[in-house]
Swiss-Prot record:
CDD domains: cpn10. Heptamer of 7 subunits arranged in a ring. Interacts with the chaperonin GroEL. It comes from Streptococcus oralis. Keywords: Chaperone, Cytoplasm. This is Co-chaperonin GroES. It is found in: Cytoplasm.
Length: 94
């Protein structure tokens, strides 16, 4: 299993038509974003005074992420992307 560092997040991209809250995203919006599930998160980032700021997302969250963000990786037969938390646009609440 992949364990990301810092503010990085491992995502499993959902390969289906994207909907948010029951609304199908327009074609142009689908080209700019992807829906994904958070698989793992890093520990967060440290502030200048040393405090740890935890990630805003957790494993199991469904998120909307920038389409061209991140690096494609494989772990066994599974394909994932690793992105910085700043590339995650929203948490999708069901």
């Amino acid at each position: 299993m992949l364990k990301p560092l810092g503010d990085r997040v491992v995502l499993k991209i959902e390969e289906k038509e994207q909907t948010v809250g029951g609304f199908v995203l327009a074609g142009s919006a689908q080209e700019k974003t992807k829906t994904a599930q958070v698989v793992a998160t890093g520990q967060g980032v440290r502030t200048l005074n040393g405090d740890l700021v935890a990630p805003s997302v957790k494993p199991g969250d469904r998120v909307l992420v920038e389409a061209h963000a991140g690096i494609d990786v494989k772990d066994g037969d599974e394909k994932y992307i690793i992105v910085g938390e700043a590339n995650i646009l929203a948490i999708i609440e069901e």
